[in-house]
């Protein structure tokens, strides 16, 4: 329905809340993995409830109604096909993230705390590229349905250029201010956590162009009614990421940096 600002605000708020709760539960209360889990569940629940309430209040067309029931001309099968592919894609992504998190945890609480905070900053940093991919998907789907293929071609050409330019800018900012960004959530005396988190941000931030392109590819294939290809891309991306993370981090000379570098390689 064209409103991408509200989900962006709620998702950003959820990420900030997650960071704050991670610091409280993991760094201050020393709750470890359980604390990180609590922080994630609470922040996502707040975001989800907030979005549901907003939708019910602001979008009458999306409210459930049992007064009119009709399966005539219903595209239920198509909805199931699209949603199943999207659900499996999200499940694969979460499973991959879980495996990476488990590997990170094996390096101790300092690395775990740094990763927990840095990955939230990382998520906020590339969030605009992700939302750009979602908007790109909507534009592609509308023109694909209208058979306006010339507009799709032009959109693809310009969107990749715009996304790449924006991602380069964000990469530069994250690389320059990585310590400052970590310092927003970690006290100055915890220098080791800041150093590890900064290393993660510089490594990931140097390759935001890759994830920007990946989001556009996801959006393109969803837009042309081929969500299964987006699923395949996700499996390949995460499979590469997880396999390399476990392989590279096994070398003592590389250590946790092997996890950091495997993520953008997977993009």
Residue ranges and their predicted role:
Residues 1-7, 11, 114-172, 176-178, ...:
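Small-residue-rich hydrophobic transmembrane alpha-helices
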Residues 30-84, 140-207, 249-267:
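Short alpha-helical transmembrane segments in multi-pass integral membrane proteins
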């Amino acid at each position: 329905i064209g409103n991408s600002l509200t989900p962006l605000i709620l998702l950003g708020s959820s990420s900030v809340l997650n960071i704050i709760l991670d610091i409280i539960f993991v760094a201050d209360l020393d709750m470890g993995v359980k604390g990180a889990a609590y922080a994630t569940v609470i922040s996502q629940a707040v975001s989800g409830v907030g979005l549901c309430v907003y939708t019910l209040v602001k979008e009458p067309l999306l409210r459930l109604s049992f007064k009119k029931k009709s399966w005539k001309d219903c595209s239920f099968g198509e909805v199931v096909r699209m949603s199943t592919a999207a659900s499996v894609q999200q499940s694969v992504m979460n499973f991959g993230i879980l495996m990476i998190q488990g590997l990170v945890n094996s390096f101790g609480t300092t690395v775990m705390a740094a990763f927990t905070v840095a990955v939230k900053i990382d998520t906020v940093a590339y969030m605009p590229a992700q939302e750009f991919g979602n908007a790109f998907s909507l534009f592609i789907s509308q023109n694909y349905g209208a058979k306006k293929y010339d507009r799709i071609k032009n959109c693809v050409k310009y969107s990749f250029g715009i996304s790449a330019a924006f991602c380069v800018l964000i990469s530069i900012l994250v690389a320059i201010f990585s310590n400052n960004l970590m310092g927003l959530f970690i006290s100055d005396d915890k220098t080791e956590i800041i150093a590890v988190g900064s290393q993660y941000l510089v490594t990931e931030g140097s390759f935001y162009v890759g994830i920007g392109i990946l989001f556009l590819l996801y959006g393109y294939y969803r837009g042309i009614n081929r969500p299964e290809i987006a699923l395949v891309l996700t499996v390949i991306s995460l499979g590469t990421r997880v396999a390399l993370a476990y392989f590279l981090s096994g070398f003592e000379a590389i250590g946790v940096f092997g996890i950091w570098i495997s993520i953008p390689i997977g993009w």
